[in-house]
Amino acid sequence: MRGKSFFFVVLLLVFCVAGVNAKRIVRVLAIGNSFSEDAVEHYLYELAAAQGDSLVIGNAYIPGCPLDRHWDNALTGKKAYRYRKIVGGVTTTQKNTDLATIVRDDEWDVITLQQASHYSGLPYTYSHLVQLKDYVRKICRNGKVEVMWHLTWAYAQNSKHSAFRYYKHDQQIWSQSEE
């Protein structure tokens, strides 16, 4: 259910941006996977521009990447990320980039973290969330950065995704596990 995931993040970020004077540029970095790609790259920029806000959007992503892998990459400096940055509507892309370089690339106002969709309702898969959050806060050039959670919602009830078995192919079980 990419639509719900995207909607939640966009809604949250738009509220965050809405209170900001339009003359200020708000810098948002997503650390995630293909769901973050959809949410921040395909929708957020246009929504903010429509209300007169200016954004710099960064997306550090690895398709299907779980939190534990993001944490391992932070510890090892592995150059595993595709990093896309949108400034003034122009997108630049860097491949094989490490997380520290991306986080230090700008004075991010907001950094979102995201679990791989299929693990989002499994609490034991969040073992390194606090460390990852503390890590990005520590190395971000903006000492007042807000770290937010990008919640991935349950797959469609008729999903054939193999990981849906973790939730007995039931959206309700998945959604309740995220509460």
Predicted features and spans:
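N-terminal secretory signal peptides that target proteins for export/translocation
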Residues: 1-3
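Sec-dependent N-terminal signal peptides
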Residues: 5-16
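Boundary at the C-terminal end of the N-terminal hydrophobic targeting segment
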Residues: 20-24
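Conserved SGNH/GDSL esterase-like catalytic core that processes O-acyl groups on lipids
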Residues: 26, 38-129, 156
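Alpha-helical cap/lid subdomain in secreted, periplasmic
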Residues: 96-179
